[in-house]
Amino acid sequence: MNKIIFVLVISFFSILSLQAQSKELGVASEIRNILESSSLGELSHDSKVNFSQYDLLIKFYSKREFKEAWTKEGGLSSQALVLRDQVRESLYDGLVPEDYYLGQLDDIIMNFEIEKMGENALQLAYVDLIFSESYLKLATDLYKGKTPQEAIKTNWQIQAKTVKVKFEEVLESAVKGDSIGQSIRGFWPEYKVYANIRESLRDYYKMASSQEENTPELEYKKLIKLGDRNRLIVEIRSRLIGEGSEVDSELYDSALLKEVLKVQKRFGLNPDGVIGPATISALNETPEDMILRIAVNLERLRWLPDTVVEDKFIMVNIANYQLDYVQDNGLDTLFSSKVIVGKQYRSTPVFNGEMSYIVFSPTWTVPLSIVRGEMIPKIKRDPSYLSRNHMKILTYSGKEVDPAGLEWSTVSVKNFPYMVRQSPGPHNSLGLVKFIFPNKFNVYIHDTPSKSLFDKDIRAFSHGCIRLHKPAEFAEVILQDNALWDKEKIYEAMHSGKETAVMLKKKIPVVILYLTFWTDTGGKNYIRKDIYNRDEEIARALFQ
């Protein structure tokens, strides 16, 4: 008997006593005895294997009267081989196949090919349990995510997915129907983009295995424009086009420009063809870098609740600086607009809610943190700051306070018992309209008077709220089922100088998420800068 077989044998039994007991007890009895004897489910081994899905194993085997699921008459079922292949394929889900006992599955399959194990019921019982443990662990990680979202310090506050499946029942059905592979794929998130991203990860693994070692990192020194000559162009051309014997290798020509523009678009940069520090950084991304990035974003999709695909919903991707109003599982886009999100130290949180009303010509009651942290110092330096910005000081009972009557030299963040409110109008920091989805973060979507900021590549300038580039158009789309609010009425309300709140007939799900990589239905990749430095934390949890 090959030595590897003994990885499945508990160490404190001798081989002879194992065989003697196994002849007396059937496989089902051995499975029951193993599960009864250890609530921790530790499998003695060269290194210990934990039955982390112990509760599900109990449910699965008790319903089938502890009968084996993966072996028959001493041989492995064809579905055992399918499961092993699915575990290998979990690499392209951004997971680690060894976490699902790939090595043990390979050893078992190899040894079954060498000799039958039908005389050893205890050994067959452990084989069965390992395959079931592998299936259930992979299934739960694909469905819920491998890393608990609350344990990762990435400000992810989206409501956790409600578990709607009974994993043990799905396994039972898959075993009976010889559909293990199909059932595993059924645990993928419902978002169609998941399968697209998964294929991109497969491509990057192929690139990583075929790439030349020690690819030099490009070093930025100065801007390179079309027609410039630069030694760096030689390496850039080699990466994007390949060698060209009849080409001036140091000249930035139109052929290379086309490829540079593709890179800039893929990374969400301004496609101007100018090779600057951001473009150099994009060109320095290796397949290994991309593998980690993609794995992180697959995990984020596994965290998302399925409820947002049931109807129309609003999605804001912070890292992409874009809002999309979509339907049909995100495949049909009804509206899109650039957005501005929170600065790194006032980052926009990742959460979900329901948009319930719109406010035209809004006032702005300045959050106390901004009043204390930013406004009081500005007012002290410039007494006209409040009047220039159309702001008033109010008591919490609503009485207006004359700023000239306050002794500003003695005012501090600790002794300012007032609120500051900005009147409606084009000067208002919220612009001419705000879209409210009540949440504990006091974050909402709104217009802004600072339109020039939308021309920037990196648009992280706000205090956490989401500033919208095309607010009037968005209001039209949101209110299209309300006959009282046509384009003219919306324009009038936005410029009336008086607050008007409009309740939506049906609340719209809103998801504020953070994706730094995704792939569209055409296989085109989109890569975005990790502006809040959140990817590394998740990658560490996934792979370490």
Predicted regions and their residues:
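Bacterial N-terminal signal peptides
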Residues: V7-I15
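Cationic-aromatic interfacial patches
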Residues: S22-V163
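Well-ordered beta-sheet/strand-loop patches within structured domains
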Residues: Q21-R64, L129, L136-K137, W156, ...
